[in-house]
């Protein structure tokens, strides 16, 4: 029951006074169908008391969509009467978002018997964008289910601002550190290396649009809740959105020349990388290829070996006009780009320039050893 209570009620972040924000997602009441109201309310308040101390001030946020599982009015009245003095006294504000007709009737009936002081703390909001005016989303981490429903209310949380600098189009050469979207995406994937189809499967377009908008506007993102496939889609989007691709046309042309040169491939490739890729691009390549290497170490579970990964994520690293030809399955063993990608996955640790500050962002899989020097 504790796990379900954590999905129903949790600390979502902090308000402008740095006090805790308790988030309640009433849609998740459906997890408690087998419990009667009295026991549910008792366990819920026990759970809340673990989240906040009796002398702590806090803000409450209720997401009330699809909240018709129980007799909502009866449940609301029992919850109000079961609320202890400290919870009642210390709540600073109660925001109710995405209300349906049943929750509106229930809450308005409840407030008719509540004290005027308590009633004044309630505020009804239509959408997450309205909530953002009172509690910035940079302070809140909300679950996917809330954002999914909000898309039925508004097409976007933030107004379009073409003049704003997007996290996804900032030149790599100007980065002082990897963007949060990449770092957190890699962390989520590294925790789920056994998931089948990493970088091959795609998440829903709705989920991808949501996480892009949140990262692009400096919000907290519970990316782990969206899942590893969404994290992979986000990473691919980031690389596709770079002003200059990770691997330039010059680099791709050089792959063919160096492959046919008769010189030792490792030596030839290293010279090409040093000549064609700036330091930040090499550090970025080192990050992503370290993750791809980790994925290959679980290929029996995730069905993604170096060859599959090269075919699935390779197009995101280049904007070449002939990318389809570059990624062709025909004569794959002689395909310079595919051959390079597979080689880079296996030898990332020695191939690309490293820097301690950037290497600290590489997610660590303790079950693996670093690849050996070729």
Curated annotation (Swiss-Prot):
It holds the Pfam family CRAL_TRIO_2. One of its GO terms (molecular function) is GTPase activator activity. Residues 170-352 form the Rho-GAP domain. SUPFAM superfamilies: CRAL/TRIO domain, GTPase activation domain, GAP. One of its GO terms (biological process) is intermembrane phospholipid transfer. It comes from Schizosaccharomyces pombe (strain 972 / ATCC 24843). Keywords: Golgi apparatus, GTPase activation. This is Putative Rho GTPase-activating protein C1565.02c. GO terms for cellular component: cell cortex; cell division site; cytoplasm; Golgi apparatus. SMART domains: RhoGAP.
């Amino acid at each position: 029951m504790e796990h379900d209570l954590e999905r129903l009620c949790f600390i979502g972040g902090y308000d402008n006074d740095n006090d805790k924000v308790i988030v309640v997602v009433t849609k998740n009441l459906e997890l408690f169908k087998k419990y009667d109201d009295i026991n549910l309310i008792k366990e819920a308040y026990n759970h809340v008391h673990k989240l906040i101390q009796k002398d702590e001030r806090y803000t409450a946020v209720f997401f009330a969509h699809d909240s018709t599982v129980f007799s909502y009015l009866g449940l609301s009245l029992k919850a109000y009467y079961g609320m202890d003095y400290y919870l009642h006294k210390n709540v600073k504000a109660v925001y109710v978002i995405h209300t349906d007709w049943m929750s509106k009737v229930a809450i308005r009936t409840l407030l008719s018997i509540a004290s005027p002081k308590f009633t004044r703390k309630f505020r009804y909001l239509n959408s997450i964008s309205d909530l953002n005016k009172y509690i910035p989303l940079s302070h809140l981490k909300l679950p996917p289910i809330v954002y999914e429903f909000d898309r039925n209310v508004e097409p976007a949380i933030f107004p379009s601002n073409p003049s704003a600098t997007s996290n996804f189009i900032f030149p790599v050469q100007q980065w002082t550190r990897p963007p949060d979207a990449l770092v957190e995406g890699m962390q989520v994937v590294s925790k789920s290396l056994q998931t089948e189809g990493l970088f091959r499967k795609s998440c829903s377009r709705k989920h991808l649009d949501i996480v892009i908008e949140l990262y692009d506007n400096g919000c907290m993102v519970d990316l782990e809740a969206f899942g590893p496939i969404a994290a992979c889609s986000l990473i691919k989007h980031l690389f596709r959105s770079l002003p200059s691709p990770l691997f330039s046309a010059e680099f791709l042309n050089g792959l063919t020349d160096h492959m046919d040169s008769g010189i030792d491939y490792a030596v030839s490739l290293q010279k090409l990388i040093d000549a064609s890729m700036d330091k930040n691009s090499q550090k970025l390549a080192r990050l992503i290829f370290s993750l791809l290497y980790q994925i290959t170490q679980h290929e029996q579970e995730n069905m993604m070996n170096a060859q599959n990964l090269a075919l699935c994520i390779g197009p995101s690293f280049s904007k070449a006009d002939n990318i389809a030809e570059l990624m062709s399955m025909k004569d794959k063993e002689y395909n310079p780009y595919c051959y390079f990608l597979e080689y880079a996955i296996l030898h990332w640790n020695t191939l690309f320039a490293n820097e301690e500050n950037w290497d600290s962002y590489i997610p660590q899989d303790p079950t693996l050893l670093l690849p050996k020097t070729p």
